[in-house]
Every structure is written in C-alpha cells, then in structure tokens.
Amino acid sequence: MCVVTGIVQEFQFGMNWSDFSRFVGDICGAPLAVEGLLAFFLESVFLGLWIFGWDRLPKKLHLATIWLAAIGTMLSAYFILAANSFMQHPTAYTFNPETNRVELTNFFEMLFQDTAKITFWHTISAAFITAGAVVAGISAWLLVRGKSPDVARSTLKLGSITILVAAASLAWSGDSQARIMVEQQPMKMAAAEALYETSAPAPFSIFTIGTLDGSEPIFSLDIPHGLSLLATHTLDGEVQGINNLQAQYEEQFGPGNYKPNIPIAY
C-alpha cells in the first residue's frame, strides 16, 4: 500500500497541488526526495527480493530482505510525516520576496522538530497495533482450524503482546501529540473539540451540534474539566476557543476566516 499510494501522490503533487508545490517545493521537496531515493528504493527492492526469493535465496538472507523492506517502510513514513509536520507547524524556513517562495534554512531542524517526532511515534504505534491484530487474527483462525497449532499458539501470543504494548504507546504518543497541538495549533484543537469560547476549566465534548455559520453551539453534551485535563494535564487549565482565536488572528493577520471546517474537524 505504501508503494502504490506513494506513486499516485507523486503525480498529485504536480497535478492537484501545483501552486502549493511551487511555493514550498524547496522545503517539502527535501524530505520527499530523500524518501524517494533512500526509503522507497530500499523497501521496493527488498520487497521484490522477498516475494521472488522464496526457495531461491538462503533462509537467513530471505528473512533479511523483509526486515530491510520493513525498515525502509518506517524510514519512508518518517520522511513523509516530516513534510506533513512542516505543513502543520512551519519551521526552519525563510520567505524570499523575489521568488515569492519559502526556502529551507536548516534541513535537520525541520526534519527533527517535535511535531514530526511525536507524529511518527503515534503513526508507527498504530501500524504495530494493526500488524499485531492481523497476526493474532490469523493465528486464532489457524488454532480453531487445528492447523499448525504449535506455531499458531506462539504467533498468537506474539501478536497479542504487540497489540498491548503498541496500544500503550499509542495512548502516550496521542496524549503528547494533543498537548503539542494545543501549543502550536490552538485553533485546530478548539475545532476538533467544538470549543467555541475560551474556557478554564474547559469541558470535553462528547456530542455537539453547532449553528450553520459555526459561531456557537446549539446543543452540547460535555464532560466537565475533561479537555483541560487532556490539553494541560490540570483540571482547571485554560484552553482557547474558536471565536476568541478568530478575533486574535484577525487582529494579528487582518480580516479573514481563520476557522477550519468545524464539522469535519470535530
């Protein structure tokens, strides 16, 4: 899936998002180029060797090919998420008024910013949960069918342990990612939780219906103090609201609509 969707996205950058690509090509192009030259070739070459190497390569070498493909996939994920993290939180760049483009000033600062690191950890944790579930599910099916019970029993145990460890990692990284979002993208968090006004403490929305213009809630079912606890790790922490941030951004950047599509974000 990584290889197939990556090929499609290469065309989308030029055809669907050409203006964006011209504006940030110097920045997003750097990690994507490394991903294409290093990670993509690593995973595609060794995945091919693994597929066509059955009964042709020595067993240890054949095993090494799928490990290298997996490493390539994780490297690929990191470089792609680094480019996405710049879109979420631009850093290590300068604007060139002569070319009307942004230019990269520090590749490693952009590559290893906090947003990229925690997003990668969160994504990989979810990937391991998926992998563990697939292994555990197939193993359970084999046990029920009575096929290779000894192997299936051990792989079921491995898959179950992977799910538990990855789930704990997913919860921790998700919490860390949310707190980084509150600092770097407060409007995104406010929209995701349908918090229209700055609150301290801030409630966690279970279900909210808002007006069509996205200016206020009509009905809301909340958990008191919940969002403050998630966003600040305190029961009475302040979380900025959509309307307050809209007014702040208008004063800072000029008139305009700085709200995301609230129903979709929520």
Say what each PLM segment does.
Residues M1-Y266:
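Polytopic transmembrane helical bundles with strong interfacial aromatic enrichment
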